[in-house]
A protein has these predicted regions:
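N-terminal flexible/basic segments that precede or flank functional cores
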Residues: 1-70, 124-150
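Functionally constrained cores in energy, signaling, and assembly domains
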Residues: 13, 35, 39, 83, ...
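Extended interfacial segments that mediate partner engagement and assembly in macromolecular machines
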Residues: 48-114
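C-terminal charged interaction modules
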Residues: 95-153
Length: 153
């Protein structure tokens, strides 16, 4: 099998390189995480292969998630599986967009604080799952119109 070539210069002198990356959390705190990419020893080009890019996204999200005290991907998956929900069903229950839960469970994206709080309410009281399921999803006319006693929107 032929060795991979540098996309910049065509050389075959490629090695994995580690670097420390910085990200700023919502509260302004600077956080660092380890990142791996590919470096060409010939021209100095540095780039991500697909798996390195995914790993970088996961590492970035993990440091932000830990700092914010959000549920982990494993905790979200365990909750969903315990209630025998598919990812699409949980998305409908929460009113999120398509593939949102997939990204949370893969660890490539952090859930918002609001979504995290809602998930925690569902975790501590399974009756909340039943309550939301009974109300339907965001496209349900009964939900869109609100219920009697709802305040102004």
């Amino acid at each position: 099998m032929e060795r991979e070539r540098c996309p910049q210069c065509g050389a075959r002198w490629l090695l994995p390189a580690r670097q420390s990356r910085e990200v700023v959390a919502d509260d302004g705190v600077r956080l660092t995480y380890a990142d791996e990419l590919t470096a060409c020893l010939s021209c100095g080009e540095r780039y991500y292969k697909h798996q390195q890019s995914l790993a970088s996204s996961r590492a970035r999200a993990a440091v932000l998630r830990k700092h914010a005290g959000l549920l982990t991907p494993d905790e979200i998956r365990a909750f969903r599986e315990r209630h025998r929900l598919t990812q699409a069903q949980l998305e409908a229950l929460l009113g999120t967009g398509p593939k949102t839960v997939v990204r949370w469970e893969k660890g490539t994206v952090c859930q918002s604080r609001a979504a995290d709080r809602l998930l925690r309410l569902l975790i501590v009281n399974p009756k909340n799952v039943e309550f939301l399921a009974a109300r339907g999803g965001p496209d349900d006319p009964a939900v869109a119109a609100g219920s009697p006693g709802d305040g102004p929107r």
